[in-house]
């Protein structure tokens, strides 16, 4: 149960991470390693595995595919000349202990680096399989031995983690609605959960603007977690006998949290889960006339509808958390700008949080020069105005820099950063006929969670772009892929289209890899499905999808045992199936390695199939 409760703590401090493992940064790794270790001890002691052989054979087969893919990837890797000892900190420390290490580093640096990388990748593959698919097999073995206790602890673990997220988010909402005391609390406790800005010097951030993320590093991860937590909490509210109103309140809060992540992943999950839930309820509705069934559907439907309405309202309020109006009153010598600003939003700009106007010259590629920050010297409530003067560097000509952008930012002791993504408009000026003139159009960069298919809104540009990069890499090696994520990093930059290289976040990833090397700074995995195609080819992608296809086929084959007979069994299957479907949808914009959720759910779903066959849940 602890492994499930710990799922939200997916980016622990570096000194706590388990080396070699991709899942080593998750707090859940500790109880899972302990559980798998106990399993091996008991299996060796009793000379049995408890796991149906077909599942063991499948995992072994998938491992063989990925192993050969990795070996093939090492053999065809075209960038060996760029590999040396300096890219591996632990190897440098190890070689430094050897006498005459300087001569070794100078003469055999490339060969030693190649051998080290090859061994590291193969060992990493073995341990990753043990803690991912091995985790799923371990859960199946627990079901074989403990039966219904597996589901009881699964439900309690999800509910326990959801309660932790809810308690945290109460403080988070106070912060988002302007409570300084909540900002102070979060400033103190967030660094206790993870190393702030440990990756690329900004991720995970201390705060995430106007978006709810709870205990997770970013809102999309919370959405992925809630894909399971919401259906499970609804089921729990239906079966819990004591304090029933309290358990009905939990899914309402979780749905509100899902909608206020302002995440496209969230809206995609909700649409997918609602569609499947409606289909299952419609099929059940046609077969049953039980008043109890109708009562449950109507009561819970009302709760869910209320939650959606409240969540959409909160999303609308938080999405436009800041609003500002600019009135340029004077421009001197094309660089001294006097303007009146008005706070037109509901959020108070407290002077202790150090609100500023930031301005800079920009070229045609929107690279900045001569940035100037001017502090707003007073607390500003809705309707308050202030007059500020911005003195930009004077330019001798405007061939390169011909645009000026002014925007609101916060540079306080708790939260920092530009506020354009939270509703505050930007003011753009440009040079026309030798004079700096303000434009009427104001740029607004608010992220819209409903813009799922947009190629430019929010993070969609780099998301769709990097998915295309993975697809292009997979096309070059369509059968076995390039042999794992570590090797894939060397192929990424050469496959990034020029149009994507101008994206700010992609530019940061490219710069980091160019400065630190291929294996010290990696591109994040954006989407599981094209990633599987890129790293393990068509065989690996099919192997990844087989468990989900097997679950679907088995559920369809067993539908007479769970869809029309016992209502309690139906609701249990309903919650897990809807949640699992939403989780698989989330991998369009996420990966299985972000949270420990998929591997636990995979074992739970196989256990569900076994329990349906035995009509015991």
Show the residue positions of the predicted features.
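A conserved mid-to-late transmembrane alpha helix and its immediate loop/hinge
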Residues: 218-220, 466-467, 471, 477, ...
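Intrinsically disordered, low-complexity Pro/Gly/Ser/Thr-rich segments with frequent PxxP/GP/PP motifs
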Residues: 369-396
């Amino acid at each position: 149960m602890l492994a499930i409760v710990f799922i939200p703590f997916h980016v622990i401090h570096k000194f706590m991470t388990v080396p070699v493992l991709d899942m080593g940064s998750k707090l859940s790794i500790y109880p899972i390693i302990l559980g798998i270790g106990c399993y091996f001890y008991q299996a060796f002691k009793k000379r049995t595995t408890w796991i149906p052989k077909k599942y063991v054979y499948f995992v072994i087969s998938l491992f063989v595919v990925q192993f050969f893919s990795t070996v093939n990837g090492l053999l065809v890797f075209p960038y060996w000349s760029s590999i040396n000892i300096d890219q591996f900190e632990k190897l440098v420390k190890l070689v430094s202990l050897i006498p005459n290490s300087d001569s070794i580093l100078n003469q055999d640096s490339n060969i030693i680096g190649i051998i080290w990388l090859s061994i590291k990748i193969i060992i990493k593959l073995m341990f990753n399989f043990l803690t991912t698919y091995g985790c799923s097999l371990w859960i199946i073995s627990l079901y074989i031995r403990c039966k219904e206790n597996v589901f009881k602890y699964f439900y309690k673990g999800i509910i326990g983690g959801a309660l932790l997220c809810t308690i945290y988010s109460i403080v988070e909402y106070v912060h988002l609605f302007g409570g300084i005391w909540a900002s102070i609390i979060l400033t103190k406790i967030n660094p206790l959960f993870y190393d702030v800005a440990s990756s690329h010097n900004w991720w995970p951030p201390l705060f995430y603007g106007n978006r709810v993320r709870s205990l997770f590093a970013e809102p999309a991860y919370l959405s992925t977690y809630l894909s399971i937590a919401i259906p499970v909490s609804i089921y729990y509210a239906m079966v819990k006998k004591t304090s029933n109103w309290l358990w009905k309140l939990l899914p309402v809060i979780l749905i509100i949290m899902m909608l206020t992540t302002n995440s496209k992943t969230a809206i995609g999950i909700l649409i997918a889960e609602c569609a499947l839930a409606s289909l299952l309820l419609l099929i059940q509705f046609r077969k049953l006339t039980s008043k109890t069934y109708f009562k449950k559907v109507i009561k819970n439907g009302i709760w869910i509808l209320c939650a959606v309405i409240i969540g959409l309202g909160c999303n609308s309020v938080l999405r436009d958390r800041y609003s500002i109006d600019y009135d340029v009153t004077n421009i001197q010598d094309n660089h001294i700008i006097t303007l009146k600003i008005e706070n037109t939003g509901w959020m108070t700009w407290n002077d202790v949080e150090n609100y500023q106007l930031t301005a800079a010259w920009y070229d045609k590629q929107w690279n900045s020069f001569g940035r100037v920050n001017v502090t707003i010297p007073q607390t500003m409530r809705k309707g308050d105005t202030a007059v500020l003067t911005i003195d930009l560097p004077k330019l001798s000509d405007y061939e390169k820099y011909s645009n000026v952008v002014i925007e609101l930012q916060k540079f306080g002791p708790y939260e920092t950063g530009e506020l354009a993504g939270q509703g505050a408009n930007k003011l753009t000026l440009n040079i026309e006929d030798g004079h700096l003139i303000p434009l009427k159009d104001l740029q607004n960069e608010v992220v819209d969670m409903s813009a799922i298919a947009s190629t430019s809104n929010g993070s969609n540009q780099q998301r769709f772009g990097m998915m295309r990069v993975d697809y292009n890499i997979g096309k070059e090696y369509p059968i076995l892929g390039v042999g794992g994520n570590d090797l894939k990093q060397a192929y990424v930059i050469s496959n990034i289209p020029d149009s994507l290289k101008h994206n700010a976040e992609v530019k940061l990833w490219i710069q980091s890899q160019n400065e630190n090397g291929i294996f010290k700074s990696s591109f994040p995995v954006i989407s599981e499905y094209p990633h599987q195609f890129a790293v393990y080819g068509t065989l690996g992608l099919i192997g990844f999808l087989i468990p989900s296809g097997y679950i679907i086929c088995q559920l369809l084959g067993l539908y007479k045992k769970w869809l029309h007979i016992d209502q309690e069994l139906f609701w249990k299957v309903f919650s897990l199936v809807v949640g699992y479907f939403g989780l698989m949808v989330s991998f369009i914009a996420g990966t299985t390695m972000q949270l420990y959720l998929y591997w636990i759910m995979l074992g739970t779903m196989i256990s569900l199939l076994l329990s349906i066959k035995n009509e015991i849940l």
